[in-house]
Amino acid sequence: APIYPLNPEGGAGLTLKELCRKKVFWLFMLMMLGAGAAENTVSQWASAFAEEGLGVTKTVGDLAGPMAFAALMGTARLIYGKWGHKLHLEKCMLGSSLLCVAAYLAIALVPNPFLSLVGCAVCGFSVGILWPGTFSKGSAAIPKGGTVMFALFALAGDLGCSAGPTLAGMVTRVCDGNMRRGILAGIVFPLLLVLCLVFGKKRRAAAGNAQADTNRSHG
């Protein structure tokens, strides 16, 4: 099946080589990796975490863990879809990333199993905006990225969806089945998002200052 272009006004899109030369593209690839991993690290382990922490059956664990996670993640995306045009996307993503870090800490460090499960649900809300938000920021920053860019973003997100739970599982196994330590190891992914967002903001500020200096020198 043909891959149709997604460029404004039907203009020519960037080639894969041109896209890969853009540093900002790799920044968004890292963000997609972090978004996918931050989401799936908790969602894939939430049921087992509920069973282990609360001593409940798998059915109850699925309801207490993944369902609460998914419900709040869906709520966050509903809010973004309905009122996203009124929100400052970058501030919302940074706030969500920091909330995700806090949720990971609650899951891993709070001794009360019920509060840890609340952390799982809050994590679902915090990651809701990260994947679609990165797509939106990427399309705004690289308007000629086209279909190839979105395909690579999705690939990076899928790699994160695999890498996050894998890392958590490996650490859990090394730590004699301590799932909290596995989740704590996964905190590197929301922290990666925070760093990328802060770096991107500073990068744009530096570019804006350089442009202002150029305009003054020609004035």
Tell me what each language-model feature is.
Residues 2-28:
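Juxtamembrane intracellular "pre-TM" segments in multi-pass secondary transporters
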Residues 22-67, 71-74:
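Extracytoplasmic gate region of multi-pass secondary transporters
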Residues 76-88, 172:
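Helix-to-loop junctions at the C-terminal end of transmembrane segments
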Residues 91-106:
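Structural signature of the two symmetry-related core transmembrane helices
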Residues 129-142:
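Intracellular juxtamembrane helix-capping segments at the cytosolic ends
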Residues 143-175:
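A late C-terminal transmembrane helix in Major Facilitator Superfamily
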Residues 170-189:
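A membrane-interface helix-boundary motif in multi-pass transporters
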Residues 185-219:
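Multi-pass alpha-helical transporter architecture, strongest
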